[in-house]
Regions:
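Hydrophobic/aromatic-rich, well-ordered segments within soluble, folded domains that form packed cores
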Residues: 46-50, 55-84
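Short glycine/serine/threonine-rich phosphate/pyrophosphate-binding segments
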Residues: 11-15, 64-68, 103
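Internal alpha/beta core interface subdomains
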Residues: 100-196
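Conserved small/polar residues in nucleotide/adenosyl-binding loops
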Residues: 201-202
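N-terminal beta-loop-helix "entrance" segment that forms/cooperates
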Residues: 27-48
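Structural motif
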Residues: 5-10, 29-32, 59-62, 123, ...
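N-terminal basic/disordered segments at the start of proteins
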Residues: 1-31
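Short, acidic/small-residue loops that bind anionic groups at enzyme active sites
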Residues: 73-99, 105-121
Length: 202
């Protein structure tokens, strides 16, 4: 379920457009608007319902969005996707949980709907690198390291540290990795061929 938080009634046509294009989406606003759910406070609503939605879309100023969600944020594995759209639909900004929560993908989708510009700041997206923390879900793989260790590996990877990739299976995902291999990644197909001095992402 997605929630659209409408700050100004002037953006109601934009909110209605997004609701039509995005399945399972409800519009919440302090204004009395037909087809919308009335709330008394955006900040209080977010505090009480932050984790009830898989995505939250603010239509309005980025500052209102940030102040509303600030006290609710836990980590990228638990937080919903949060996207902020300016009142005209010109800029669509991925705010929170870009990869794991899907905010980056939703940002691109909304920008395509509004004809606006998708603003995405995650390094792997802008550098054209793999989003390591979403590959498992995309290709039905399993992550076997703790979140903290995964975050450390992601940081090393996006900073283009020399990386070893062991591909000891073949499926759609490994074929994608081979096709899109970054220059700082070296592939091995047998574990015993990897020099022990090198780090391993497996």
């Amino acid at each position: 379920m997605k929630a659209i938080i409408l700050i100004s009634e002037a953006s109601l046509p934009l909110a209605k457009t997004l609701q039509r294009e995005l399945p399972d989406t409800l519009i919440y606003t302090k204004n009395e608007c037909e087809g919308c759910i009335s709330i008394t406070s955006c900040h209080r609503f977010i505090e009480e319902h932050f984790n009830d939605f898989d995505s939250i879309i603010f239509i309005g100023a980025m500052g209102i969005c940030v102040r509303s969600i600030a006290g609710c944020i836990k980590n990228k594995y638990k937080d919903p996707a949060v996207v902020c759209v300016d009142s005209t639909g010109r800029f669509v900004i991925s705010v929170l949980s870009g990869h794991v929560g899907g905010a980056n993908e939703l940002t691109r989708h909304i920008a395509a709907i509004t004809g606006g510009e998708a603003v995405i700041t995650t390094q792997s997206d802008n550098a054209g690198l793999w989003a390591l923390d979403t590959l498992a879900e995309k290709y039905d793989w399993k992550i076997t390291v703790p979140h903290a260790e995964m975050n450390r590996l992601v940081t090393l990877f996006v900073n283009r540290e020399p990386t070893v990739l062991l591909l000891d299976i073949k499926d759609k995902g490994t074929e994608y990795l081979e096709r899109t291999l970054p220059a700082h990644v070296k592939v091995f197909y047998h574990f015993e061929d990897i020099p022990q001095s090198l780090s391993l992402i497996h």
